[in-house]
Amino acid sequence: MDYLAAYLDHLAHERGLSPLTCENYGRDIRTLQQLAGEITLQNLKTAHIRRFIATLHGRGIGGKSIARMLSAWRGFFAFLSRRHGIDNNPCVGMRPPKSAKTLPQALSPEQASKLVDISDDDTLAVRDHAMLELFYSSGLRLAELVSLNVDGLDLAEGTVTVTGKGNKTRIVPVGRHAIEALQTWLPERTLLKTADEAALFIGRTGKRLTPRAVQYRLKTWAIKQGIAGNVHPHILRHSFATHVLQSSGDLRAVQEMLGHANISTTQVYTHLDFQHLAKVYDQAHPRAKKNKS
């Protein structure tokens, strides 16, 4: 039996995880299978898992990535125990090597505005303008953006209904610039779409955009707009959270808009906010200015 296929089906249809999340789980569990080689799932021991972790660490894979893999493996074995009678979970109690904590990368407000300020009137550029404005305006995850349907938009109210992790829905505000960009895109979309396509963002074929297509378009626009560094979809979500928190100081509101189940996940942005405050302090306070030497 293909246990991995059964587990991925369970994640998609019973737990309601996004295709992108399921793909990531699949990749992590295939890594386990490759490391295990001829050792069966029933015969894997804690010592094997410890050796696999050391191997991954030796390849330069960070503690955060290994922690994610361990979590995926642990969940896989728990599923096998519940559904298929394989009562073996060699990952219980295993911990990944510690890695240095890194804060989410965010663009400055000026960089974010420059990135999304697309003035080209080509159909795909019009779409990309609406897509990036909405990304930044509403702090969406990549999987949430590509899964949006037209009927989730309420431009009159200035909101979008989003299906997030665990199939949970939330209503998120949409900013004025994003509304204007979407109003320009919707008539263009009508000319491209296939008869039964409900997706808000579609490609030349009239079908829903894939996550990879969005990643590629974002990187292309970052280069065109002169934004340096690794610009990826999540950076717009980080930028949204950081900039809203800097302006409002309302952590709970940011938590709601991001769709975080736990406020501790949102609290990382308070560290980014402190970095901003510290920079302002260093530049503005007369007793903070460093002597030039």
Each PLM stretch: what is its role?
Residues M1-S293:
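Conserved catalytic core of the tyrosine transesterase superfamily
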